[in-house]
């Protein structure tokens, strides 16, 4: 793996900090979520999925090898 550039992606995950309180007659007031346009295309969306698949590959392969030996 020498000579291969390493890339680091930072992922931001929204966390709700305020608790919605019931208003009149016990109803909760919800905000309508607006769709945001995806910046950067599909690559930032696919990178974590690809990384997870690469990380899971050795485990899947070892299970397949053990199953084939039985």
Curated annotation (Swiss-Prot):
Q: Where is the signal peptide?
A: none
Q: Where in the cell is it found?
A: Virion
Q: Where is this site: Cleavage?
A: 26-27, 41-42
Principal localisation: virion
Q: Which Pfam families match?
A: Adeno_PX
Any chance you could tell me the propeptide residue ranges? 1-26, 42-70
Q: What's the superkingdom here?
A: Viruses
Going by the UniProt record, its keywords in alphabetical order are: DNA-binding, Late protein, Virion
Q: Does the keyword DNA-binding apply?
A: yes
GO annotations of cellular component type? viral nucleocapsid
What's a Gene Ontology MF term here? DNA binding
Give the UniProt family note: Belongs to the adenoviridae pX family.
The task this protein performs is described as: The role of the precursor might be to condense the viral prochromatin for encapsidation by virtue of the two basic domains.
Quote the protein name from its UniProt record: Late L2 mu core protein
Organism, as annotated: Bovine adenovirus 2
The gene from which this protein is expressed is PX
């Amino acid at each position: 793996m020498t000579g291969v550039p390493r890339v680091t992606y930072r992922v931001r995950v929204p966390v709700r900090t305020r608790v919605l309180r019931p208003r009149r007659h016990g109803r909760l007031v919800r905000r309508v979520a607006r769709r945001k346009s995806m910046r950067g295309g599909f690559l930032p969306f696919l990178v974590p999925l690809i990384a997870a698949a690469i990380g899971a590959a050795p485990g899947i392969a070892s299970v397949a090898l053990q199953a084939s030996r039985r």
